[in-house]
Amino acid sequence: MAEENLELSLLCTESNVDDEGMIVDETPIEISIPQMGFSQSESEEIIMEMVEKEKQHLPSDDYIKRLRSGDLDLNVGRRDALNWIWKACEVHQFGPLCFCLAMNYLDRFLSVHDLPSGKGWILQLLAVACLSLAAKIEETEVPMLIDLQVGDPQFVFEAKSVQRMELLVLNKLKWRLRAITPCSYIRYFLRKMSKCDQEPSNTLISRSLQVIASTTKGIDFLEFRPSEVAAAVALSVSGELQRVHFDNSSFSPLFSLLQKERVKKIGEMIESDGSDLCSQTPNGVLEVSACCFSFKTHDSSSSYTHLS
């Protein structure tokens, strides 16, 4: 009953609403919590534990079946929501990790909660709420909710409406916002791709994050685990996709938990999406992703093979 009341209380206002009174105790938030920051000294056991727990941060099993079965409202709604989140990330110069978190929240929510059909404003409100939550987790500076809503949307929502939707999302996700995404693993896998287990360069990490954000919007990637996607991206970007050798003694025991053919399939899907992924990535992603973390750079002596 409480959940029904919460849903019924969601309000929507047209885009010409008066700003007066819309913001309730809302000021820009500054948070510094890196979502992907594994140091070289962190143990294999921690990463392997993440692999074991990553399923807790995925959409329900029947979600991709519903998307593939031709559920038009769900497909179109998801696409429009992700397109808006992408544009908002571009405008606010949020990094690809923020986009991936927002997408994760959106998919997990839609997989367990049916929204009423024919009410596009609810999906728009959901998109705003998911991006707001992701930004609070990942970004160091978060705009006020009214300022977050960019791109000339059909609807602009009061802060209290977004906050109510945020609460509904939090309840449905069981408050698990520190989601494990492909971004969570990418630095680790890139390091394992190097010849000397060296720290990857900012450039290589940025490029990998671009590929993750650019490609995983497609529904076909939902059938794969975040660790599998991260491994495939690391292999692809480092030029090792065609030489997948998980049994190599220099590789981590973690690779024994991955299915070689599934990882290779993801890599082929990524490469088939085209070579202009970076040009499709939101403006500012390179700058934001490079400065979000304190990486050691080894550009001058990198032993990685960069794709041209």
Curated annotation (Swiss-Prot):
Keywords, in A-Z order:
Cell cycle, Cell division, Cyclin
CDD domains, per database record? CYCLIN_AtCycD-like_rpt1 (cd20543), CYCLIN_AtCycD-like_rpt2 (cd20544)
What the entry lists under InterPro entries is as follows: Cyclin (IPR039361), Cyclin-like_dom (IPR013763), Cyclin-like_sf (IPR036915), Cyclin_C-dom (IPR004367), Cyclin_N (IPR006671), Cyclins_cyclin-box (IPR048258)
Q: In which tissues is it expressed?
A: Expressed in shoot apical meristem, leaf primordia vascular tissues and tapetum of anthers.
Q: What induces it?
A: By sucrose.
Example GO biological process: cell division
Q: Which domain of life is it from?
A: Eukaryota
Its annotated function is as follows: May activate cell cycle in the root apical meristem (RAM) and promote embryonic root (radicle) protrusion.
> Assembly state and interactors?
Interacts with CDKA-1, CDKB2-1, KRP4/ICK7, KRP5/ICK3, KRP6/ICK4 and KRP7/ICK5.
Q: Which family does it belong to?
A: Belongs to the cyclin family. Cyclin D subfamily.
Know the name of this protein?
Cyclin-D4-1
Q: What is the lineage of its organism?
A: Eukaryota, Viridiplantae, Streptophyta, Embryophyta, Tracheophyta
Task: Report which gene this protein is encoded by.
Answer: CYCD4-1
